[in-house]
Regions:
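Domain-length cofactor-binding catalytic modules of enzymes
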Residues: 1-51, 61-64, 75-77, 87-96, ...
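Active-site beta-strand->loop segment that positions catalytic residues and contacts the acyl thioester
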Residues: 57, 73
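Redox-cofactor-proximal catalytic regions of oxidoreductases
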Residues: 82-109
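A glycine-rich phosphate/pyrophosphate-binding beta-strand-loop-alpha-helix module
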Residues: 106-126
């Protein structure tokens, strides 16, 4: 049976496609997909556009139900989906955040250039591999007691920095300064605590990675200078989230939300969009637990940052400060946040769900660090193991077009099982090494699942985002060494 989506799409311009409100019963607004014509053909190959239409049925939704060009099918919301609901009349949906709450990306800068980094890449990767636990069920080097973990859930990255695992200025370069308000550890189950207490400081599995990169192209020298980026610079990109803790939080509250749908007589075309009014007890319990998981993820990336710095110190025999290892920025791409946005000339308080989408606030936004406020925030977009990553800058138009949101990566075009089958019998590590990318992984299966062909062309995704006015490219960086599960 074909999984092609044959619903209506109206071309607005080269970069935007509309799903009309009358496409299906229950839609309260239109769906809007950011893509070019070639990508639309790919996007129609699964049911992700149907999920865009389903999200448009959420009570209290305002603006469009949005999808970024890296859209693909997910749980409830499509991955690459953005949906904003009114705080006072709308709902919150765990399917709009996903299981890996605050899966996100952090980039650490260095003062090194490639001629210093490339000869040391094997030593660096080996040291990192032995310093940072990775893989399914991996356990961290530090075990946290329940009271200590509760502090992490409230204070996020700050709790880790206060224990000596970071610099005081680190938190200034993290979205929400690494600690989102509203956390309530009493909303978190005992099972989530058990899963989380040994997983802080771990990379995890699947598409999570740690990558050493070098800056290959600068598109905007002025903003690159403000970001502290220069040609040939060595960067480190960390991509991970809240591990088993966030997964358990989502699992626990999905069950609650299923019952809440009946309680509040909410009817939706997909039970995976289970939700509750934001201000209901169920909505608030989920939001408080989700914030705990988001703070857990920021703490996780902070611990990993400490061990990255430590690893570089060992290999180069210089201090991390001397190596210029400050944080460029840290962004979440699976999260629901309370934000104010202008809709039809009114400022509205909204719950913005971003699932596989990155905040891309433009210039002048008070939530941004002082350093970036005049130009817009860094938007960190990983590609695949073979092609590299982009660092973008949020644009003013994104505030009008997408609730200040952009893409989060390349987006899959093959399922993990399809990728695994297509790569059978190949030595992926050798293929990447021939391209100058050293890879170290616990599992060859992960490398097969994460082959470059499993992903869209990140350059094409970024072009759409830029042409649509959501974020503009500042820097392109290529990998020289990648650590996976």
């Amino acid at each position: 049976m074909s999984n092609l989506w044959n619903g209506p799409l109206k071309k607005i311009d080269e970069w935007r496609w509309l799903i009309p409100r009358d496409y299906k019963k229950g839609m309260l607004t239109e769906g809007l997909i950011f893509a070019n014509e070639r990508m639309i053909g790919e996007i129609r190959k699964d049911q992700a556009p149907e999920q865009v239409a389903n999200v448009a049925c959420l009570p209290g939704i305002v603006g469009y139900s949005l999808a970024m060009p890296d859209i693909h099918w997910g749980y409830g919301f499509p991955i690459g989906g953005v949906g904003a609901t009114l705080i006072d009349k709308g709902v919150i949906s765990p399917g709009g955040v996903g299981f890996d709450i605050n899966c996100g990306v952090r980039v650490i800068k260095t003062s090194l250039c490639s001629k210093e980094g490339i000869p040391k890449k094997e030593a660096l990767l080996t040291t990192l591999f032995h310093s940072i636990p990775s893989g399914v069920g991996s356990e961290g080097r530090i075990k946290f007691s329940i009271p200590e973990l509760k502090k992490v859930l409230i204070d996020g990255a700050k709790a880790i920095i206060q224990r000596g695992f970071g610099w005081n200025e680190d938190e200034l370069m993290i979205e929400e300064q690494g600690a989102m308000a509203g956390a309530d550890p009493t909303a978190v189950s005992e099972k989530a605590f058990e899963r989380g207490k040994s997983q802080l400081g771990t990379l995890g599995s699947g598409n999570h990675f740690l990558e050493i990169e070098t800056v290959k192209q600068i598109f905007d020298p002025h903003i690159a200078k403000i970001f502290g980026l220069f040609p040939d610079q060595v960067l480190i990109m960390i991509h991970t989230g809240s591990r088993g803790f966030g997964h358990q939080v989502c699992t626990d509250h999905l069950r609650v939300m299923q019952n809440a749908m009946r309680k509040y007589n909410i009817q939706l075309p997909d039970r995976q969009l289970a939700c509750a009014p934001f201000h209901s007890s169920e909505g608030q319990q989920y939001f408080s637990a989700m914030v705990c998981a988001a703070n857990f993820a920021w703490a996780n990336r902070q611990l990993i940052t400490h061990w990255v710095r430590e690893s570089f110190e060992k290999v180069f025999n210089r201090s991390a400060q001397d190596l210029g290892m400050s944080i460029l920025y840290d962004v979440a791409h699976n999260i629901a946040k309370i934000e104010q946005h202008q809709i039809n000339e009114k400022i509205l308080k909204l719950c913005v769900h971003r699932k596989g989408a990155t905040r891309s606030f433009g210039p002048g936004q008070r939530d941004l660090p002082d350093k970036y406020r005049s130009v817009g925030q860094p938007v960190l977009i990983p590609g695949d193991m073979g092609t590299g990553s982009f660092i973008l800058c949020g644009m003013a138009r994104s505030m009008e077009e997408s609730f200040g949101s952009a893409c989060h990566g390349a987006g899959r075009v093959m399922s993990r099982s399809e990728a695994d089958r297509s790569a059978k019998g190949r030595n992926i590590a050798n293929e990447l090494e021939e391209k100058g990318v050293l890879v170290m992984a616990e599992s060859n299966a992960t490398l097969r699942e994460e082959i470059p062909a499993a992903y869209k062309d990140v350059g094409e995704v970024v072009t759409v985002v830029e042409k649509a006015g959501l974020a503009r490219r500042i820097v392109y960086a290529q990998p020289i060494a990648v650590m996976k599960e």
